[in-house]
Amino acid sequence: PRVEVAFKAGDDKTERRLLIGEKTATGGDLYAKTADQPRVFLVSGFLDPTFDRKNFDLRDKRVLRFDRDKVDAIEIASAQSSGRFAKRDDSWRMTAPLDAKADFGAVEGLIGRLGSGQMKSIAAAAPESLKEYGLHEPDVTVTLVAGSARTSISFGAKTADGSGVYARDASRPLVFTVEPFLVEDLKKPP
């Protein structure tokens, strides 16, 4: 088989396997069979991309997991500057390095970008050292606060080809890459 799919159907706890073969001569269908039966049948060819996926295609690619509506503070720290924003009532205030009204749209936009940010690739599942990714001393670290809960993401060096930036969610060991635009706004002084 070209692709093997393991699945469980409904309340049945038994794992089944669907074996997907090559396309038919006309190219409109795919040969298929279940692992426990000799009978070969056809499935529609438009399903081919559904079956032919890599592990990365199926994983949750969010860079951070958080409830956007519960975020009540943001801390941004870089080598150049740092800032803290706190939500009071329905508005955002900069509380560090000085106390001032913050641009609601800019702060909410940042939260939105972090919430919808996606991994481009996995650089290392459990790296021995963060130095080669520039994460031992990150360029920028963002911490989102929701009551007593905190979640942080650090951004390090650019990838060799410049198409991505290494990042790490503090709650997971893996190092992944993200689009550079996700980091650019974070480097601006508050």
Question: In which residue ranges do the predicted regions lie?
Answer:
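A short-motif feature that recognizes glycine-rich, charge-decorated loops
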Residues: 1-190
